């Protein structure tokens, strides 16, 4: 969501804009590269990329590894086989953004945080019926103002307090059924979960991480437990849109510039 303009934009569009701005700077971008190890004391990164293994050192390092989706299926309350027309949020965005495909005309959305409302809005904008949304919670995880914002695009048919549920359909999803027999029919099930920080690299490198929440232990100014290490974006915890992460990173850049002086 691009909050400053009050509209929903595709991630590739926003990333394209950022890439054009970076192209006008001296920023070196290495794609197809993975950080496999960090040495916080030496500010050293071990990289694996098309050219093989290599090491980099820096005066300051920003961890912006984002977050991954923890779905209800991982928590054990959503049972059943993953048949055709069952997808996670990343599948929904891929079908819609990259391929222009509508995965379901009558979708059932499992989950109720901001990710679920964003997926519902994308489905509605692509031409689906109003989604059915179910969750274990009695009220949606997304806050009031977040839900109010998305009412411009979607007003899901909400059902809360679902303690256990299972997928319906042998070869393709035909809906979801609760343990007490309530059915929510549909031609596609979208499983949307909360985000947990991708802090494994920091944990393995010896930086301070709270368990079991995986939250980074931060000092004022988004500084991590080792001097010269900082964090930005969704790795900080919670769910934030791309524009929030952009502004958060821009504020941090000013602090790092001061740190390097």
Model-assigned labels for residue ranges:
Residues 86-96, 188, 192-239:
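FAD-site-proximal beta/loop scaffold in flavoenzymes
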Residues 74-77, 120-123, 201-204, 243-244:
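Short amphipathic alpha-helical segments
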Residues 1-17, 106-146, 212:
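Beta1-alpha1 glycine-rich phosphate/pyrophosphate-binding loop at the start
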Residues 69, 113-115, 196, 236:
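Residue-level detector of alpha-helix initiation sites
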Residues 232-260:
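A conserved FAD-binding loop/helix module that cradles the flavin
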Residues 11-12, 16-106, 175-179, 190, ...:
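FAD-binding core/adjacent interface of flavoenzyme oxidoreductases
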Residues 19-47, 56, 124-213:
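A Rossmann-like FAD-binding core segment of flavoenzymes
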Residues 89-90, 94-98, 140-147, 167-169, ...:
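Short, charged, surface-exposed secondary-structure boundary motifs
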